[in-house]
Amino acid sequence: MQKRIASVVLLLALVTPLYAARPAKTAAKAAPPAVTVDTHADTPSEFLDHPFDLGILNTRGHFDYPRMKAGGLDAEFFAAYVPAKYANKGAAAYCMKIMETIHEMADAYPTWVRFATSTAGIRSAVAENRRAILIGIEGGHAIEDSLDLLRAFYRFGARYMTLTHTNTNNWADSSTDEAKHNGLSPFGKQVVLEMNRLGMLVDISHVADKTFYDVMEVSKAPVIASHSSSRALASAPRNMTDDMLRALAKNGGVAMVNFYPVFLSDEVAKASKARDEKLKPEIAALKAKDPSEGSEYQEGVRKLMAANPLPKVSWTVIVDHIDHMVKVAGIDHIGIGSDFDGIPSVPEGMEDISKLPAIPAELKRRGYSDADVKKIMGENFMRVFAEAERVAKEMQTAK
């Protein structure tokens, strides 16, 4: 595997043309149709551990291509999630492995989807009556403190990177770990600027509040929160405060609402914490049997969670978060980032990606215009992505 990864890295410079976006053929001056975008799904991690046919309707998980079509979703960012256990060794190799898996997940189903790396690529896929698959790296430890690796991952298709996951890394503090840098370290600021130069979106989901505000000061391009909800409605530390939402709006960025009930409801979060405490001995026993936290461990945890369900929350709570965040940040700065296949439970009525149309329908019921709904469902993200592309060209030209 290491030899294969090394070979892939050496060939990265040749990879980009294979995945270059072809501009859609549209009438002169005609506005392109609105697209729907979900900025975070962890389906690749599921696929890596338990491969399945994405081209047929499945009963497991939250995502496959028929359900993507049924949900009216035009573009999905698959997360190249790098578990924190790789932070000290093997993070880059694992990241390359899961990115390669994402390419395979797209390339094996050409009638359904195409791989994309740009706004033009997304719109081109829609024009071809296909859907777009993109890559976002989850966990900045993936780059192993190397700007060269960051550039290599960009060439292999990554178009955003979540600066931290649940762990504080060597250059950025996480919202759910010990602070070591008082936000971003000097190298962390270099990472943000290099992401700006490349055209890779800076994702502030999971980061500590101070890290977020440091990014606001440093970034030359608008940033995203790929899967974060409102802390005013649910007090999870990885959710965004109203002040953070206002700062993000000033930056020109966009925050995507997460669908995980624990991040939507304090009642569910409290029950989840109690359940975790109750199941701690059993989970420890599973980890002792499978220290690598592989498929045996994951399946055992799934069974424990299923046997100890959390309180139910309605899918309309997702829209409550959208509504509040729009009121704080403005209509141009909110989107959706489901976290499907990365969350152990979902709201009732939002069991998988096929249920997505309920959200725009509810937004319209609450008085949102068609134009505003299109912004929330994808066009806000597309605007930010396009601006990041513009800033990158400007920075590259300036040197």
Please place each PLM-identified region on the residue numbering.
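N-terminal hydrophobic targeting/anchoring segments and the immediately downstream early-domain regions
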Residues: 20-182, 231, 235-399
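Bacterial N-terminal signal peptides
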Residues: 7-17
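Short, contiguous, pocket-lining structural segments
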Residues: 180-187, 203-208, 240
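Positively charged n-region of N-terminal signal peptides that target proteins for export
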Residues: 1-4
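Distinct, well-ordered alpha-helical segments
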Residues: 146-150, 211-221
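Alpha-helix-loop-beta-strand connector modules within alpha/beta enzyme cores
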Residues: 181-197, 215-225, 359
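Substrate-binding cleft of carbohydrate-active enzyme catalytic domains
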Residues: 193-204, 210-211, 244-250, 324
